[in-house]
Amino acid sequence: MAQQIVQSLQDEGTQSLKLDFSMKYVLGYRSDFKNNIFQYTMNDQNRIIYPAGNTIVISNNENKQQFINCIPGTKGITCMTLSPSKRLLAWSEDCDSGIIVVFDLIKLDKLEKAKNQNYQEPSDKDKLDKQAEKDRRDRFEKEKREKIDKLQKEVKRIITTLDCKSRHYVALDFNKINEKRIVALSCAPDWQLIYFQLDKQKTVIINQVPLKVGDNMRYTHCFFHPKEEDFIVAIGTGAIKPYKLGADGQFKQKDPPFVKKESKDQAHSPNYLSYCILQDGYMVIGTDMGEILLFQPSCEFKTILASSPKNEQFAIQCIQPYSKGFLVGGKECTILFYEKDVDLKNPYKLCSKKIQFRDMKAMITSLLLTPNEEKLIVGVDSGQLLQVPFTSDSMQLNEENSKCEPLFMPFHSDKITGLDVCIRKSLVATCSVDKTVRIWNYSDNQLENSKEFEEEAYAVAFHPSGFHIIVAFTEKIRLMNIFENDLISFKELSVKNCREIQFSNGGHFFAITNVSMVQVFQFYTGENPSNLVFRGSGKVRTIFWEEDDQGFYTGSTDGLVIYWRVDDNGPQKTQIAQFNNLIITSITGLYNPDTTTQGLERILFVSGVSSSQENEGEKCVYKLVISCRQDKEGREITDNTLKKIYYVSQPEQKIFTGTNVSQIAISHSKKLFFFATEDRPGAIRITKYPFTNEIMEIQSHFGPITRMRISFKDNYIFTAGEDGALIIYENKEKEYQVKIENESVEAAAEEFLIPRDQYNDQKREIEKLKRQLNEERMKQEQQIKEKMKDRDDKINQLENQQKDSDNRDLNKYQLLEREKNEMIESYEEKKRMMKLQHENNKRTIENEYKKKIALEMSRNEELAREKEKEEKRFQSEIQQYQEEHLRQMEEKRRHYEEQLAIEKQLYNDLHLKREELAYKFDQKRNKLEMEAEELIDQLKEENESKMQVLFKNLEKAEIKKMDRRNDYDTEAQKLEEQKSKLKGTMEDITSIQETNKMLQKEKESHAKEIDEREKTIRDKGRRIYELKKKTQELEKFKFVLDYKIKELKRDIGPKEEEIAKMKEQIANMNSEILHFKRTNANLKLIVTDLRLRQEGMKKEIEDQSKVIQQNNQYIKAFEQDMSDCHQHIADYKKLKQKVLNLYNQYVQGDDSKKKRLENNDQQKEIMKERAHLETSVNNLKIKHDKNQSVHKSDTTIIMKHNTFLIFEINHLKREKKKILEDKAKMLMQATQKKKQDGTSRVDIDSLEKEIQKNEDEKRKLKEDIEKLRQYNDQIKNQLRQQIQNQQDDDEDN
């Protein structure tokens, strides 16, 4: 038993590997959930947020990306949302208990700035000694780490609750007012609305969303009201549920929004796919059938927009608001525009223009409009991100300015099946099930080349030169040249179902798989020598070439690892190992550097997926040490060389991973080992080689990883998965990269292939442009010289003009200076005069003001004395009024207490009467129900017994009818056979008559010849005698045939009578069946009438119960109003007002209420009578329709009989005509034969008798037809009479 050396990579002793290794770029987009594209913060409109793989990507126009990774151990993002201020990003992840992650984007920017902050070296003036410089640097690094740790804790918050039994949430939304609360909708099985407080990180409210059992209800969205933070709405397939936060802290469901919907025009599909809250507070919801539902801000249904694309069944997947209305996205990459309208019934109208991407037929799942409304970003379900120029004016839209283009570059839309990296160039090639092959530049993060084919591509391989690739398709393999903008095939190999292609390290060979067979082709010739066709067992899944290209290893689905030699220095096939219940998916290896023997040891690593549950716990990677030795016994005679034999020199080692591994690889520097997982989510694990207990894991793919490759310098790693994403990782550790001494080799090659015609065209174009450039230079130099001359002339002219203008300005300045001095002197004189005038006016105004002040002071003293007198009088009046008010209040209180006692006594009496009436009513209602149930049960039993008897009779009649019909069919078949025989005999007779005619002609010719030639009379006479004998024999044969015809007619006669009798019996049976059906229909109508009466009684009972409830509410309202009056017993005015209200409400309104109740009773009686009349009318309509159908079936039967009779009459007419023609011909023949034969007369007599007989039969048939017509008329009259009687009965009813 082989010794197992267990090296576990998942035990408790593992540590995190510290390595500068991270994702550089993600080429892909996840479109499996909707509304997942967001704009970054308001200040930065160039960055877009979207999910790709198992991460969230923040990408900008400069082709750079930031990544927000998911929590390790979860299974991917399920929904996303962004706060209104675009600061907080929240998403949910799939795990055992639902997880919500809230991410602060502003602090993310601060974190990036802190990470990029570097230590600034001091200037020459501030130079310190080495120790102080070191302390300062250490202090800076410590502060930087503390700041980064603090921001990392603040930037991401994880929210979860144990009350959630779901694995994930399907919808999230932030509170629109302060963004401190978030609502989440969990999926099956519990469907909960959970309300979180972000500042405290706790669950505030949990409310179970009711889900009807048996319905296909599924909630997909939840959101806050934009202006009310306690109003939440949940929508989905089959439901719209609004909730309001109650005073008790729990959500209470409001009325459904469709309660008031009564019109049939408002019927719509219940599958709500998308929603949008518009700027005016209205809500728009789209359905799968194209209806756009408009809701008021209170979540009350208003209308279905008349311009909804419901006739096209345009499933509305997403809705995006904009300044003039909203956009609608759906199938076939079509975006519709809706703008605000003045019509109150339909406030939004559909614009005539729309955006449609004609080249794509995918479904739009996400829409994002930039804040300045200049660009529209579209996400489609084929995994593509598109952009289109946008304008809010729909009239400016046309095909030119609405052309779409990829936002960054086209991605794969389905599972990536092939991946390979180029050695000489920074290129990586991928192929996918979406029938495309793409070549990416991983240094510039650009798509270099792409081509779409008609078949799915399963594998791709890059030639080491970087000029060629090989792609495996469903039916063939194509060898292609890589041109600047195209991939052109130069050879095709007809190999089917190839799933793996690998170039040798030198590029002169490439190996392909063909189920269990591996074929090695010479690349430069495209030949496959017979000695390079290797056959194994099981499907080959992976190929690994040795470094010297002398052979390669293969792994298959049956767990076999086989080494195949390409040269002749050993056995062509060597089985290295076999692993039971293992599907091998990847092999890698290296030469053992510790080997000291002559032969080099090879270390091989094998990974795969367990094919049985027995080995499910043993998930590991196998390590094999392979050695070679020389086979001295099997020495080659031709060249005296020794063959090499390969064998496993050490026991296999197991490297436990804890998960299925799909791909493994070792770096070219032999210092790092990479694992790619098969499980979801797809993760890449890195560990040092030789193996240690340090591991680094990045869960980057949403689905399993299908391919993994490493660049030649080990600075980049590439993975591709089933989620259609290609992820580029960057290794910045120089220690773990390949060290290349020659610096010229480090630069990637930039050569590319170009067709010779294109090269010549470009060369000619370059020469032409050079000539044009020289000509343009000459022209420009000449133009510059001329311009310089013109410029100098203009400068001189301007200088002269400037001198003249300076002289004129100087003269003007001197003149203005003199005027200024004169004006200053005049203003000084005016100022002195105004000061004197102001002093005189001031003295006069002060004297007048002092006089007015003295008068006002004396007047104020008089008013104060009057005020004291008025206050004393007012106090005495207030005291008198208070005493009077208290006396009146006491009297009224006593009066109202007496009235209250009387009212209470009346109330008690009314309460007792009500209880007595309710008791009597319950007794009567129970008695009526018992009687009605007994009567219904009795009628049910009688009807069921009658129905059973009728069904039994019907079954017996059906059986008899089928038997008679079978007999009729057999007899009709026999009759047809006899008619066909008779037709054959008549054809024989006609052929004989034709031969007879020919003989008659010959006879006449012979008679003429007798008259003309006397020499041949004897010979002709003999011939005439022979011909006579022949005619006699033919006449006898004719007689025999006539006799047979008569016998056949005798046999047909009784059979036709039997057929007629059977027809009559079938008609009678059909009439009986119709009678049974009518009786059955009448019984059904009686049953339905009884059921309708029962429903009417139930409605009466419900109406009575409603009346009782109304009376109870009336009494309770009175009690409530009385208690309100009692509260104001101390306040006289309020008490008076309340009592007056009670009197007006309950005393004066009694008569009107009684009249209203009486009117309601009369209306109820009228409604009952109307319902009874409507049911009777419906029953009469059903009877009439049934009678019409019976009458129609009878008339069709009669028409069929008539057509049959007309057919028989026409047939007899044709026979009569034919017989008359035959009779005329026979008479002509008889007159010609009278002279030669006496027997012809007898034949003519027999023919005349036969004709007479046919005439008699024809007359009888006419009589039978006339009788049948009379019978049909009688049936029609009877049916008309029955219909008239039924109509009379219905009118009487």
Curated annotation (Swiss-Prot):
Chief location bin: other
Protein name in the entry: Cilia- and flagella-associated protein 57 A
Family statement drawn from the similarity comment of this UniProt entry: Belongs to the CFAP57 family.
Domain of life: Eukaryota
Gene symbol of the encoding locus: CFAP57A
GO CC field: cilium
Keywords: Cell projection, Coiled coil, Repeat, WD repeat
Comp. bias regions, Basic and acidic residues: 122-143
Region (Disordered): 117-143
Self-association and partners: Forms a heterodimer with CFAP57C. Associates with components of the nexin-dynein regulatory complex (N-DRC) and the CFAP184:CFAP263 complex.
Pfam family, one: WD40
Swiss-Prot/TrEMBL WD repeat ranges: 72-113, 309-348, 359-398, 411-450, 535-574, 700-739
Lineage: Eukaryota, Sar, Alveolata, Ciliophora, Intramacronucleata
Function, in words: Associates with components of the nexin-dynein regulatory complex (N-DRC), a key regulator of ciliary/flagellar motility, and might act as an inner dynein arm (IDA) hub or linkage.
Coiled coil: 756-1016, 1045-1079, 1209-1285
InterPro entries documented for this protein: CFA-57, WD40/YVTN_repeat-like_dom_sf, WD40_repeat_dom_sf, WD40_rpt
